[in-house]
Amino acid sequence: MKALRMVIRREWHRMTSRRLYLGVCVVLPLLCLFFMATIFGNGQMENIPVGIVDLDNTATSRNISRRISAAPTFRVTEHFTDEADARRALQQKDIYGYLVIPPRFEQKAVTGTGATLTYYYHYALLSVGSELMAAFENTLAPVALSPIVMQAEALGVSGEQIQTFLLPVEASTHPLYNPDMDYSIYLSQPFFFVLFQILILLTTVYSIGSELKFGSAGEWLEMARGNILTAVAGKLLPYTLIFSSIGILANYVLFGPLHIPFAGSLWLMNAVTVLFIIATQALAVFIYSVFPKIAYIISVVSMVGSLGATLSGVTFPVTAMYAPVHAASYLFPVRHFTEAAQAMIYFDAGFAYFWQSVATLFIFLLAALLILPLLKWWIKKEIREEAISASPSPCPPTALSTASVIRHEWHAIATNPAILLVLAGGIFLYGLLYNYMYAPNLVRKAPVAVVDLSHSALSREYIRLLYATPQTAVYGQTPNILEARQWMKQGDVAGILY
């Protein structure tokens, strides 16, 4: 216990003597928290710049333009006289979409001779494109039905009969757990911890690697009385306390001033957060123990942190990725923390619903403990090499030519797997891996539950259509809506058709 306290005091002195640690351990995480707390604004995509190409210039076309201007999603910034100018503005990102009202639109709409409204949107930006597509459809839907409504009213048909005729089956959509479709509710919390885990990985690797890099590993191990567990625990404990304090502060900020809905136990959320931080440190210890070269491993853990951001399942569902990528996602602590946190945030789930994720986080600690003897072997090897290099050489050093230095460095690069990994990963393989992760491109076979209380031919036809849709897969049918909600709470289904 005395050795542990001595290692902790030594590490605390190292931390307070260099401003680098203050910046990485305190300032950067707080900046990330401030950034994620403010980046999404009110949580809605509003006032997206769009344009209108009105080639009809009639009362009907002007009414459509007013509808577009009144929609909160749109901000009409330009009116164009031809489509070429609108397309050029879209390519330059001056606007993100535009509506084309063709010539003689009003005449065709009144006579029912195939009036068409065409809208274009920038779908390379997926979130913006999806928002614009939904907004265009919702805003222009009444316009598409207006000719039929006008003719029916002229024939004396009541408004209720028109509504029944146009929409015999009305869909009622209920976005559960985020009814306002608020981006901040869904993204602020996981994105902060995704950034946070990268800082934890880098700090942990640097704090251990600097001992070997600057030749103080022998002193560090000697102060721990040769016990590598005491040495690593004493070194990382100050960082664990600082990171845990920031993680708990982030939870209070996200679920307090930001008003992210959370009805679960904040104590349990804080406990899982601390466990996630320790598991991330354990992953960093494991990676560094495999190949303790700080210059290369810092690049490797940066890649690991970036991959964890994708494989956490926040930006694209991991279940929709290829099977090898899906399996690899479980090698990242942030994946399991995200699953546990989302179960508590969205479903108000108890520990029984995410105990597997918590148990997996403990496995990272076990892996780090098992590899500590290898880290100790590397440290002792470094100490022996330093002792040999410090002994006086009987032969005076010979001057090396420039060609000899170049050959030596080239041989080091060609024979060092860590350097090759960093170069290949950063330049080529890393990009291929990201393309492979997003290769499915579309979410397919998303599991849904069906609650059919009608048992009619029409309801069975709807279910057959659901089976035939490539984006969905019917997980099960039940007459009990509460059972379907339970499936969703357990993460077995992503939606319910009632």
Language-model region placement:
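Hydrophobic alpha-helical transmembrane segments of multipass membrane transporters and ion channels
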Residues: 24, 28, 197, 201, ...
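Membrane-spanning alpha-helical segments of multipass transporters and channels
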Residues: 36, 57, 88, 241, ...
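Helix-loop-helix units of permease transmembrane domains in multi-pass membrane transporters
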Residues: 203-242
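Long, hydrophobic alpha-helical segments
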Residues: 188-207
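Extracytoplasmic/periplasmic domains immediately adjacent to an N-terminal transmembrane anchor
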Residues: 1-184, 391-498
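Residue-level signature of transmembrane alpha-helical entry/exit and packing/kink sites
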Residues: 3, 21, 25, 235, ...
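Hydrophobic alpha-helical transmembrane segments
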Residues: 127-144, 177-192, 211-222, 243-251, ...
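Alpha-helical transmembrane segments of multi-pass membrane proteins
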Residues: 13-17, 193, 229-242, 246, ...
